[in-house]
Design a protein with these regions (language model features):
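Low-complexity, Ser/Thr/Pro/Gly-rich disordered linker/stalk regions
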Residues: 1-62, 147
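Secretory/extracellular carbohydrate-interaction modules
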Residues: 42-114
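Beta-strand-rich interaction surfaces with strong enrichment in secreted/lumenal proteins
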Residues: 50-57, 125-131, 159-160, 170-171
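Short tryptophan-centered beta-strand motifs in secreted/extracellular beta-sheet-rich domains
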Residues: 64-66, 134-150
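Short, aromatic/His-centered strand-loop micro-motif at the edge of beta-sheets
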Residues: 115-138
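Short, solvent-exposed beta-strand-to-loop segments that form ligand-recognition rims
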Residues: 149-174
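Ligand-recognition surfaces built from glycine- and aromatic
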Residues: 165-189
Length: 189
């Protein structure tokens, strides 16, 4: 699967889905060669937390990549969600998920679980190195049994994730600033 985020080229593959952490349900704005999140005036950083996930679930041996850029403080991320359920307004929501999040100083990996009244947020990895805002960056994640193999530009690492489900929904999220997504590819063994 090779998807460019140009007008009319990506919508049939994805579904909007949202974390239970935030009540808003924003959409991406289409630009000529990419999709971008918008400023909302609600969040502290003033930008929407916007997610789209592929419609099918994937497991071990799947490799997903995206090309994205971000403005200062932006954090484009790969979303790995266990399950989806509908909220009272009919929007898809996810409660347990992992994030591989780029930012100006490298990337982080988070494991987030929805609890009864709050979220348990576990910081699994911080990999520090400079990433330039406004420049396109390539992110690839390969799902392995309870492991994630991660490449960001020319750097790589492998991470043990004991709570990684066998089958997951995969997609992208724009977080903590303005983010642009240009392309997404997916391969399976």
């Amino acid at each position: 699967m090779d998807i460019t985020f140009t007008k009319g080229n990506w919508e049939r593959y994805f579904q909007y889905a949202y974390t239970w952490r935030f009540p808003e349900t924003p959409k991406f704005r289409q630009e000529e060669d990419c999709i971008v999140n918008t400023r909302d005036g609600i969040r502290q950083n003033g930008c929407d937390f916007t997610s789209i996930l592929l419609k099918d679930r994937y497991g071990e041996g799947t490799r997903i990549s995206f090309s994205a850029s971000f403005e200062s403080y932006g954090a484009p991320l790969l979303m790995i969600a266990e399950d989806l359920e509908k909220d009272s307004d009919g929007n898809l929501r996810f409660g347990h998920y992992q994030e591989v999040a780029l930012w100006e100083n490298g990337f982080n990996v988070w494991d987030i679980h929805k609890g009864e009244s709050s979220f348990n947020i576990e910081w699994l990895l911080r990999n520090d190195f400079p990433l330039t805002p406004g420049q396109r960056h390539e992110v690839t994640v390969e799902l392995r049994k309870k492991r994630l193999k991660i490449w960001v530009d020319d750097r790589s690492c492998e991470l043990y994730v004991p709570s990684l489900p066998e089958k997951v929904y995969l997609g992208i999220t724009a977080c903590e600033g303005i983010n642009r997504f240009y392309r997404l590819t997916l391969e399976q063994e």
